[in-house]
Amino acid sequence: MQPILDWEKNELNTTGLGLIPMVIESSGRGERAYDIYSRLLRERIIFLVGPVTETSANLVIAQLLFLESENSEKDISLYINSPGGLVTAGLAVYDTMQFIKPDVSTLCIGQAASMGALLLTAGAKGKRYCLPNSRVMIHQPLGGFQGQASDIEIHAKEILALKGRLNEILAKHTSQTIRTIEKDTDRDNFLGAEAAVKYSLVDAVLTSRKVKHE
């Protein structure tokens, strides 16, 4: 699945340059340094930033399971800024979100496109949010295959089956009909924050921090 916009092909890779901010905490036992994402994980905040890949999906899944083991009653917050990605990887995250006991609250920051949009709307009902200038995009799965005619037919059937399953998931979490979902995902369908609320992809637009993460 393709990103919404790709302004810079040679985007600065801050991870590779070691520019992830570090947080120093002092206690009676001395000082301890955390990278910023690990520190936020202590507050039960998980980030899904960038394409949904096997690697990023596995990291999110591991963090979800870890936070459930730490406290199975407290909500988990999943912040999403993603252009989408692998369907199977995204569905693995989706299944884990539904499987674990804590509610997973989702928040779109920037964009939630394709599989990112599905994960956004898969958050706990009443706890799905986006920021005012966020963009959400839904569409049908993309795919391509080369080979013998019989193999192409097999893969075409699989893509259609995935399309049907993704439509069912969107219908379940938005309360839209399957027919409506099929029509609205036939092509790339972009929605602003308020439109995403009207479509029931999210429950509210947050303009300031009104929801305290426990």
Swiss-Prot record:
Primary localization: cytoplasm
Domain of life: Bacteria
Keyword field contains Cytoplasm: yes
Enzyme class: hydrolase
Active site positions: S114 (nucleophile), H139
Subcellular location: Cytoplasm
Entry's Gene Ontology BP terms: protein quality control for misfolded or incompletely synthesized proteins
Enzyme Commission number: 3.4.21.92
Any Pfam family the entry gives: CLP_protease
Catalytic activity, reaction form: Hydrolysis of proteins to small peptides in the presence of ATP and magnesium. alpha-casein is the usual test substrate. In the absence of ATP, only oligopeptides shorter than five residues are hydrolyzed (such as succinyl-Leu-Tyr-|-NHMec, and Leu-Tyr-Leu-|-Tyr-Trp, in which cleavage of the -Tyr-|-Leu- and -Tyr-|-Trp bonds also occurs)
GO molecular function, one term: serine-type endopeptidase activity
Keywords, in A-Z order: Cytoplasm, Hydrolase, Protease, Serine protease
Keyword Hydrolase attached: yes
InterPro entries for this protein: ClpP (IPR001907), ClpP/crotonase-like_dom_sf (IPR029045), ClpP/TepA (IPR023562), ClpP_His_AS (IPR033135), ClpP_Ser_AS (IPR018215)
GO cellular component, one term: endopeptidase Clp complex
Primary role: Cleaves peptides in various proteins in a process that requires ATP hydrolysis. Has a chymotrypsin-like activity. Plays a major role in the degradation of misfolded proteins.
PANTHER family, sorted: ATP-DEPENDENT CLP PROTEASE PROTEOLYTIC SUBUNIT
Family indicated by similarity: Belongs to the peptidase S14 family.
Subunit structure: Fourteen ClpP subunits assemble into 2 heptameric rings which stack back to back to give a disk-like structure with a central cavity, resembling the structure of eukaryotic proteasomes.
Name of the molecule in the record: ATP-dependent Clp protease proteolytic subunit
Organism, scientific name: Nitrosomonas eutropha (strain DSM 101675 / C91 / Nm57)
Lineage summary: Bacteria, Pseudomonadati, Pseudomonadota, Betaproteobacteria, Nitrosomonadales
